[in-house]
Amino acid sequence: ETDITSCDDGRIYEKTETLSEEGRTLKMSGKINGISKWPDGYSVVVAGFNDESEYAVVTKTIPAVEDDEIQVTMTGVSDKVTTIELCVINKLRKRVISFQSMDDLTAVDDTILMDVGTVNVGMYHGIQEKVFNTTCAHCHGGSSSAAANLYLTEGKSYEALVNRPSKKVDGMLLVKPGSAQESVLHTLLNTTISSTWGYDHSKEIVSSPILTLIDDWINNGAQE
């Protein structure tokens, strides 16, 4: 074996230098409500992402505190991080829903500040904001009428879906709490059952994490 130590410069380097945490520190403050409504497998976090991936580079779990101002400190925000988000990730650290995002990462004394204000990060609220509002409501209640008289707009969708009998599939509920497999919403999004109803809804949501999110919401009791 070659003795590679013979040609070093003789100085002893402190090992701690190579172990010091890389990058900046984020301090996030705000009132963040609804964390406890998420089931196992999901985490409400502040996270750093780069442009290339939906997987978080660095994360810090946010404690479940209702109606109280909290501050969360996340260290190790490297230069690879281009956005910081208040979001929900799955077990693989993949972004499922983002509630707030910040790409101005100006640091003062190596500290980035993020004030999120008051945010509802509840599971159903996330589905409403990021799925129903963006994908479903333009046909279901966004205008003066709603397709199939089904309103999926904010404040109306929960009543319209949960424990409501389907008008299209006899004997089934639109959402049966505790059983996605027996819910028309699940079947509608994951199969072509609705292709004979005038519109194939399975084209609407192709993101696997979002389909899983809706199933997990139903299977965990379909709470509001």
Regions found by a protein language model. Give the residues of each.
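Aromatic- and Gly/Pro-enriched helix-to-coil junctions and flexible linker segments
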Residues: 1-72, 77-224
